């Protein structure tokens, strides 16, 4: 696909988004920046952008092959990809299969507790408010999404959880929890967006429960790039990804 990168449209914590000569296509460059606690902790980690781009590209391609519509078009280089332009729904959708992180602190349930069924949580995307946990009633109040869009998002999220658990199970990795974002394309269709990587997923080794995700950075537990490289290598060994 011959697309020309134009001016910078938006720079976030982990990615730069550029306009292109096609109004419906955007150019994404993954950065080596690492942040945690709503930007309170920051670092530059060489190789992180490459690994997140490669892992996210692999996963989005797999999900597309399974019939799950998403914004990914193609990988351009180790750190770059093309995506469909969408209007982001201001919600972070978190799926929890095992208790960890903020859920453990909030509810007083020990980290590592298996959930009988996945729990879906919604967070309002607003840095100034600290991305608060909200209910579906709050979503209507904030006009963040319509009831129909929320039902579509929940349905897609459930399917994505099943697919991701299958992918990571084949890699001998436990999918503890993960964050999804969604957008609306030019026709108003809900599409899976943003990224799916160890930045947005909690991933533990199935045998040892070793953390292979951004908690290594959050909690100063070890090398982020070594863990991300391990996830990338395990995914690369799966024939269906």
Swiss-Prot record:
Family: Belongs to the SAICAR synthetase family.
NCBIfam families: purC
GO function terms (MF aspect): ATP binding; phosphoribosylaminoimidazolesuccinocarboxamide synthase activity
PANTHER family to which the protein is assigned, alphabetical: MULTIFUNCTIONAL PROTEIN ADE2, SI:DKEY-6E2.2
Keyword entries, A-Z: ATP-binding, Ligase, Nucleotide-binding, Purine biosynthesis
Natural source organism: Bacillus subtilis (strain 168)
EC category name: ligase
Protein name: Phosphoribosylaminoimidazole-succinocarboxamide synthase
Pathway(s) of this molecule: Purine metabolism; IMP biosynthesis via de novo pathway; 5-amino-1-(5-phospho-D-ribosyl)imidazole-4-carboxamide from 5-amino-1-(5-phospho-D-ribosyl)imidazole-4-carboxylate: step 1/2
Upper taxonomic lineage: Bacteria, Bacillati, Bacillota, Bacilli, Bacillales
Catalytic activity: 5-amino-1-(5-phospho-D-ribosyl)imidazole-4-carboxylate + L-aspartate + ATP = (2S)-2-[5-amino-1-(5-phospho-beta-D-ribosyl)imidazole-4-carboxamido]succinate + ADP + phosphate + 2 H(+)
Alphabetical GO biological process terms: 'de novo' IMP biosynthetic process; cobalamin biosynthetic process
EC number(s) on file: 6.3.2.6
InterPro entries xref list: SAICAR_synt/ADE2_N, SAICAR_synt_PurC, SAICAR_synth, SAICAR_synthetase, SAICAR_synthetase_CS
Domain of life: Bacteria
């Amino acid at each position: 696909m011959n697309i020309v990168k134009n001016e910078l449209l938006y720079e976030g914590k982990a990615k730069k988004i550029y306009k292109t000569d096609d109004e419906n296509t955007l150019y994404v460059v993954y950065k080596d920046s690492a942040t945690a606690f709503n930007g309170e902790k920051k670092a530059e980690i060489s190789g992180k952008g490459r690994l997140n781009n490669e892992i996210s590209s692999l996963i989005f391609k797999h999900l597309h092959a399974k019939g799950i519509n998403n914004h990914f078009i193609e990988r351009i280089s180790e750190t770059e990809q093309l995506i469909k332009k969408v209007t982001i729904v201001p919600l972070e959708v978190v799926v929890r299969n095992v208790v960890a992180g903020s859920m453990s602190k909030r509810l007083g349930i020990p980290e590592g507790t298996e959930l009988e069924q996945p729990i879906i949580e919604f967070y309002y995307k607003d840095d100034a408010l600290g991305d608060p946990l909200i209910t579906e009633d709050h979503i209507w109040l904030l006009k963040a999404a319509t009831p129909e869009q929320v039902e579509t998002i929940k349905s897609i999220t459930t399917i994505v959880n099943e697919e991701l658990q299958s992918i990571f199970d084949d890699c001998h990795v436990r999918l503890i929890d993960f964050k999804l974002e969604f957008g609306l394309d030019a026709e108003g269709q809900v599409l899976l967006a943003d990224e799916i990587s160890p930045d947005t997923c909690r991933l533990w080794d199935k045998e040892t429960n070793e953390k292979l995700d951004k908690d290594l950075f959050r909690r100063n537990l070890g090398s982020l790039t070594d863990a991300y490289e391990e996830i990338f290598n395990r995914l690369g060994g799966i024939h269906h990804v």
